[in-house]
């Protein structure tokens, strides 16, 4: 069943307006800093409350302003990977995982730790782990809770460049068999192109219609989208004939060929 988010929330600079529907696979939400990406995830997770709207996951209503339904985060069954990982600092790696499990299983916890290269760190605290190890632990903990969808909030932004690609591959391997919706927030167009199946953009709190990623990059629909995919040479134009335009910012006349 689809994952549906139709919400509005008044923020200081704009009104957040999100209307999306997605199913299994990775949907990227790309946008600049302050565009509303992270706030959208927080509303879905129940950390923030929209002013109005509706959120349902797998046929289960998480939020409905008209019916005064607003499930707390722990009852939404949504996995959320924060930029800062949000590990419990006074718990060991093994304890960070077992605390979210519906049925405690120390053998399974150790199996996960070993599978993802943390077998020797079961009794270590987060402060004693590297950035990459913390991210792996946060991913294991998130999956151990058996979520019905996953929210990834700039998951690689805190990592050094030389390990970022390695962690991308590791995260994708960990999510390979997760056949439920994944919302992946990023401002990095290369990251989005490598990892996502479909893309929607955020501009001043407004979420654009979802498109297949190749179409999104090949034919951006707004100036904002064009900048997000790396197009920097943008100019206002005036049509001067059927097949010619005048680019105001470049002081150039250009031919625009038409194709049937």
Label every PLM stretch briefly:
Residues 45:
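Helix-to-loop junction immediately C-terminal to a conserved catalytic motif
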Residues 62-79, 220:
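ABC ATPase NBD coupling module
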